[in-house]
Each structure stands twice: as structure tokens, then as C-alpha cells.
Amino acid sequence: MFGFGQLIEILKKDPKKIVFTEGEDPRILEAASRLLASNFLHPILVGDPEKISASAEKSGFNIRGAEIIDPMNFDRMDEMVELFCELRKSKGVTPEQAKGILSSANYFGTMLVKMGIADSLLGGATYSTADTVRPALQLIKTKPGNTIVSSCFILVRPSATGENEVLAMSDCAINIHPTEDELVEIAGESAECAKIFGIDPKVAFLSYSTLGSGKGEDVDKMRNAAHKAREKYPNLPIEGEIQFDAAVAPRVARTKCPQSEVAGHANTFIFPDINAGNIGYKIAQRLGNFEAYGPILLGLNAPNNDLSRGCNAGEVYSMAIITAALA
């Protein structure tokens, strides 16, 4: 089952470069110093080199070896501006406008990924989710065949057997009212994400109804989405619509859906909307004593993840490992 040691071993074999858009933030600097000491990731800090160095020195963090790139003094800015204008030509962006936009650390950092200078990006310690995600949607864009970006939380809790209990929950942060087809896409992306963390995905499309016990448009949406997902991913164990207790409790599953291979053993949960998803993962985190990692953005051409503005340095460090491992 999942442990960060597994991801670190993968990264040691193929170290990645990760952009931190808030290079002066002490939490970012502490995480970067830990990553540099471990030597399995190469941090790129965006910002004024003098301010970053002063902040690191004041906080007592050794960031020697980190690459610092200043948007105001970038030797490939003309190339970046030209590419940005090409990517945004449908909006009629001029070079002067591009230079102004690229003074934003979020847009600048995202373009570093787009240009191949970095493999992934982590931001949001001081910016809103919208400010962090918008450049990725405009510049990195979705993978071929994908129509949306979604999100997944990985929840980890030590079990009595000594192995970690690991679950995946989606979409808890991005899509407010996903359609049936969007739920299908979310399920497929979440299952692939789950595999990276050692989960053999068993997918449950959650509802207040189990296999027809309730009725209504919301029930129909989850039932139809589960049916479409089974058709699209024939090798992926999927159940739905299903209530949470039937999805996770074998005793309840034997009563409500005894023929299901997923019921009672689900580990990848697809919520009907963002309300249910956000509430659900936070209940698991606060009352179930799970560590929650995310939101992990799914469906992009390159990893771009969003931190909570209330994050600490340990959470930055963990999300950096996760983000790099997805590259």
C-alpha cells in the first residue's frame, strides 16, 4: 500500500523539476530546503532572487542549489512572449499585453512548464484556486480526449495491520455540478491517479440510493454515469449508484447488493457534486483521522497542483512529491 517512500524511490531514479510560484514564502522555502537536502527533486523558485535569498536567510533555510528565476529578468522572455501570444492568439493578445500578463508568477510559472523548463508546478500558498488553476487551463490545457479538469484527494490512514489504508475521493474541488459524461471522465482519471498511490481501484458512484432503492434525477444521474463508465472502462470494477455504507461495509453490502464485486470493498469514490465531495473528504479527514493530500488536479497535459492557503511546510513538501510523481 501507499507510502511516500515509494514515490521518493521513483523520483530518485528520474528526478523532476518543479516550479514553486511563491518563491519568497517561508513555507515554500522550508519545503524547498528539505527537497534539496534529499536530492530527489529540483526546485525552481519564482521571484526576486535577492528577496528570496533574504527570506531564506532570515528563516534559517538552506536553499543552496535551488534554481531561482525572476520574471523581471528572464533571459528567454522574448521566446516566452512569442509562445504565449501563439497560445492565446484566439484572444488577440499582443506582445505588450503578454508581457504584462507574464509578470504574474502564476502565468510565468505555468509557461516554464509549457516551455519544458520544468516538469510540474505547485502554487496556491498565497493565491486563490482560481488564480492557480486558470493559467493551467489556458496554457497547459487538457489531455487529448479529455474535456474537463477535475480533482482528486488521496486519503491515508494507518491501519491495525501496519499497512496504510488509502482511499481516493473525487471531485471535491473543481466541478460544481458535473454531468453524467463528466462524471465518467472523472472516474477514469481518478482510477488512474489511485493506481499511482498503490490503490487497486474499485470505483463507487455514490448516491443516497443503492441500485434503485431511491428515485429522482440525482439518482438517475449517478446510475447512468456508472453504466456509461462500465462501458468506457470495461476492465475497471465499478458499482453505482450506491450508498456509502454499502460501498465500504461488507455486512451492509451483503444485504443491499450481494452480487457486487465492488460493494463493501470500494476505495475510489465518485461524488455527485462538489458539495458532497468537499463535505465527504473533510469528514474523513476530521472525524476519520485520515491525512488528506490534494486537491490533485487531473486531466491536464502536465501536473499543476493547488495548495491550500492555510498549508504548512510539511504539506507543501508532501504535495511537491505527489506533483512531481505525476509528471
Predicted regions and their residues:
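Anion-binding alpha/beta catalytic cores of soluble intermediary-metabolism enzymes, centered on
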Residues: M1-A263, T268-A327
